């Protein structure tokens, strides 16, 4: 056990006897399973016990092979060599698959980023807003999982929410330039037109016939349609209330409002972090899920 602890990442294979003075072979295997070492370190058990129950238990505990005594040294050598070679090939395959997944995810993020930048460019903004939303969304999600386990926020889900957050305003593609880029406050009628961007964005994603049921697209749809909903039901377009609003949309809504407050706009100057948080907590930008406030109430300014 002490050798496993000391050389864990450097061990190529363990030859394990069943009968040992302090801890038997099954005990060692159980210990390795508890620490997930058995996934990375192949074990060959060598034993004089040849009953089916012993062999089955050994394989159930994760051994790669079981050699019965007495044994031939050359046969043991070949089986050790074959096991090490097999595990090495598996590791190379896992690395290859991981690289392919990484490249696919990187390309997905790149295409989404390009599309979102097009929207921001048309909206007359620098494109930094999308990057800010990504960063703030990720920070809020990280704090949210520390605060509660109420939501399904696995690493994969959080990653998709962060990626999809870049598309939150994609519906603005369908808004008239004169309204979208008006250098002043909007009239009530113009604001009603702007509000349609959430439905337009969701409809665009719904029209993706072959991809609309993909998890990333579903999350992006929820964010597009409902990132202007508010926890008290006074948002738009559907007046959803409380937990009727998907957590993805709740988090992006808060990130969107916070970034809008701390950023310069044609109709206003940027507020400080402290002032922005104060305005959000006072409900000046609508009501949000109290749990999601956690990150913004930290004393340190968010670096975006």
Segments (PLM) and residue ranges:
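Metal-dependent catalytic cores of enzymes that make or break cyclic nucleotides
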Residues: 120-296
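Active-site beta3 strand of CheY-like receiver
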Residues: 9-15
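C-terminal output helix
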Residues: 53, 71-80
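Single conserved hydrophobic/aromatic residue that forms the stacking wall/gate
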Residues: 295-304
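Receiver (REC) domain active-site loop signature in two-component systems and cognate sites
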Residues: 20
């Amino acid at each position: 056990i002490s050798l496993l602890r000391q050389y864990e990442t450097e061990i190529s294979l363990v030859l394990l006897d069943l009968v040992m003075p302090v801890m038997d072979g099954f005990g060692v295997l159980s210990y390795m399973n508890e620490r997930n070492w058995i996934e990375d370190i192949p074990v060959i058990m060598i034993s004089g016990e040849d009953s089916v129950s012993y062999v089955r238990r050994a394989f159930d505990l994760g051994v790669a092979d079981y050699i019965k005594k007495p044994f031939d040294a050359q046969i043991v050598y070949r089986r050790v060599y074959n096991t090490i070679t097999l595990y090495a090939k598996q590791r190379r395959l896992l690395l290859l698959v991981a690289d392919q997944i990484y490249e696919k995810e990187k390309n997905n993020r790149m295409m989404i980023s390009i599309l979102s930048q097009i929207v921001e460019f048309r909206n007359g903004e620098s494109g930094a807003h999308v990057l800010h939303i990504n960063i703030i969304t990720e920070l809020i999600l990280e704090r949210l999982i520390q605060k509660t386990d109420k939501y399904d926020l696995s690493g994969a889900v959080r990653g998709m929410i962060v990626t999809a957050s870049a598309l939150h305003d994609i519906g603005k593609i369908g808004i008239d330039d004169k309204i979208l880029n008006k250098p002043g406050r909007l009239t009530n009628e113009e604001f009603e037109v702007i509000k349609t961007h959430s439905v337009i964005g969701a409809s665009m994603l719904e029209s993706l016939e072959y991809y609309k049921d993909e998890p990333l697209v579903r999350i992006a749809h929820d964010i597009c349609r409902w990132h202007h909903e508010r926890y008290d039901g006074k948002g738009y377009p559907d007046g959803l209330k409380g937990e009727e609003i998907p957590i993805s949309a709740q988090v992006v809504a808060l990130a969107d409002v916070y970034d809008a407050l701390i950023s310069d706009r044609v109709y206003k100057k940027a507020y400080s972090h402290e002032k922005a948080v104060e305005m959000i907590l006072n409900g000046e930008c609508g009501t949000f899920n109290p749990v999601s406030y956690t990150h913004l109430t930290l004393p340190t300014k968010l670096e975006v």
